[in-house]
Regions:
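Active-site-proximal loop/turn and secondary-structure-junction residues that shape catalytic pockets
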Residues: 9-11, 28-30, 61-64, 104-106, ...
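Structural motif corresponding to the early beta-alpha repeats
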Residues: 22, 26-119, 235, 239-240
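Histidine-acidic metal/acid-base catalytic patches
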Residues: 2, 9-20, 80, 85-88, ...
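N-terminal amphipathic alpha-helix/helix-capping segment at the start of soluble metabolic enzymes
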Residues: 1-4, 48
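Active-site acidic/histidine proton-transfer and metal-coordination neighborhood
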Residues: 69-171, 264-266
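Catalytic-core regions built around general acid/base machinery
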Residues: 40-51, 121-134, 188-191, 219-224
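Hydrophobic faces of well-ordered beta-strands that scaffold small-molecule active sites
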Residues: 3-7, 24-26, 55-60, 98-100, ...
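Short, flexible loop segments at the rims of nucleotide/cofactor-binding pockets, characterized by
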Residues: 2-3, 76, 149, 176-178
Length: 266
């Protein structure tokens, strides 16, 4: 597996490289800046140019103002234009994965039927999937904890929507924190194995990097292994403080590797 931290700080990215991580995951608003001119994006790239660690994923695909479900969903052409900018810039930076969590943009208003939301969401994925494919980018739909978002909560649910898009560029992400908050089983990950393209994790209950509080990641890694997943895993949680960050990140990485080895041993 390849391990990363989520960060928008080049200094923290440099610490991750020193600690032995394989890549970093940034956010679309901070790094790609799709609502800003090209010069803003180039400045983002320049900020990371001297940090010797690749950027291989970007999260927070849609800002909350670009609603994609409900009666106030923005026009499809506007969403597609935004997505095209994101994919084009990610491709220019060599970033192959964009994470479609964006709970604020997809949360359903009271009374809006899930069936209508499914139709809206699949229509969007079907429209933007080919755009992503053309740029060599994959879209990872991220199921979120029910306490954070009321739409797309389980890994198998996300996979079903990805399949319905008809696009090979659309897959699903398994996030250990959300998966555990929702009390999912390994079965939801196994049911998504044909569309599983990315993973996140953090501790429960405090949503921290591994090693900061006790948490057993082995069940999550066993579920990933059962699904045949051996790809990228990004830590999306609170990181160690700056005083001993490199040591803390090394501990996080060691914790993950040990949990993975434990899972593989059964």
């Amino acid at each position: 597996m390849r391990y990363a931290i989520c960060t928008n700080d080049p200094a923290v990215a440099a610490d991750a490289r020193e600690a032995g991580f394989d890549y970093i995951e940034v956010s679309v608003p901070s790094f790609v800046k799709p609502l800003e001119p090209e010069e803003a994006f180039e400045a983002s790239r320049e900020a990371y140019r001297d940090v010797d660690i690749p950027i291989e994923a970007a999260n927070l695909f849609l800002p909350r103002e670009l609603r994609c479900t409900g009666p106030d969903a923005v026009p499809m052409d506007r969403l597609a234009d935004y997505a095209e900018t994101v994919f084009r810039r990610l491709a220019a930076a060599g970033v192959p994965i964009v994470v479609f969590g964006s709970g604020g943009a997809r949360k359903l208003p009271d009374g809006w039927p899930k069936e209508k939301a499914d139709g809206q969401f699949v229509a969007l994925l079907s429209r933007i999937g080919p755009l992503a494919e053309r740029h060599g980018v994959q879209i990872a739909v991220e199921p979120l904890a029910r306490v954070e978002c009321n739409y797309i909560n389980t890994v198998d649910e996300g996979a079903a929507l990805a399949r319905a898009s008809g696009s090979p560029a659309v897959g699903v992400l398994a996030d250990c924190y959300h998966w555990a908050r929702n009390e999912e089983t390994a079965g939801t990950i196994l049911a998504a194995k044909d569309r599983l393209i990315h993973a996140h994790l953090a501790t429960m209950p405090s949503r921290k990097a591994p090693g900061i509080e006790p948490y057993d990641f082995a069940p999550f890694f066993r579920a990933l292994a059962a699904a045949g997943y051996d790809g990228r895993v990004s830590i999306e949680g609170g990181l160690p403080g700056p005083e001993r960050r490199v040591d803390g990140l090394r501990k996080a990485l060691d914790t993950l590797r040990a949990a993975h080895e434990t899972a593989l041993r059964g």
